[in-house]
Amino acid sequence: FSLLQKKKTPSPLFLNGEWGSGKTHSIRLVRALALESGFATMEAVLNARTCPPNYPQRIMPYMARNIAFGEERGIRSVIGSLLRDDKKAGHALATVGDRSQADIAQAASTLRALSSHGETALVGTSTAWRVLTGTDIAHSDYGYRRTKALLRLHWTTAFVRAAGAKGTVLLFDELETIDQLWNRRSRATAYEALGSFLDAPGTWCVFGITERFLRVVRDDARSDLYWQASIDGRRFLKMWRDGNEELIAPPKVADEQALELAAVVERMYRDAYPETGDCGAEVRSAVSDWSRNAARNPRRRPESGGAAEG
């Protein structure tokens, strides 16, 4: 966060954990910390069908829907609140310029003009939102639409920063689904998009992955696909080819920590719903079941390994 705040580009972070290891919870923790620290966040859960990494124009609507900054959620709320401050919006639009994306810059300017004239109803129904959310290009597979989506993302992160955010944290979960793409060419295109995400202005990328992704990307980085990739794709693969990736595992949770966490959650529910009775026994029973269930708990203790193998 400190590097991002200083307008430096941090190395991407890869959270490596299998199902049930707490990988997604760790991504949520990064998101919460980023928002508390004055950063914006955008996120997407990738899959090869509806949110594939080789088609950023399909990813963009998910990221627009999940953008967050301060108390605002969703691009209508985030961008809308920034545009309502005419002075701040004017400064941000002037600072960012069109970023080679005249359509999204024009859409934002249109919404700003409507907002400044008090046309609240027109702001809410304006077709300019389709450009900002990316839904106008989401169903097109043309290569130039891929480029347009990436440039729009770059514009959005630059605008949010110019309007007051310390930067934007891009969160991607389930990156291992890259192995579900049709072929090597599809993966090469995905690496190009990933390399462009890393290049977005004022951003830090955090990816949730499993061993499946590690096997695929390391094989591709050592194969001729590396030389066939675009400049952006090669930049992403070079990180793996040179062994410069930053990998961490989700924190392991021991029984004592699980009990403590469960007790905190119980207290939160009792504070929110005072009529809730004492659930201490149920909490302890749930934690005990969790710790014994090796199939759902890859963080199991070493002594439970025999049961898992059986």
Predicted segments — roles?
Residues P12-V160, Y273-G277, A281-G310:
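P-loop NTPase nucleotide-binding core
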Residues F1-K8:
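Pre-Walker A adenine-sensing motif
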Residues P10-F14, G167-V169:
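Residue-level preference for the first positions of well-ordered beta-strands
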Residues V131-L132, I137-G280:
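The catalytic "switch" region of P-loop NTPases
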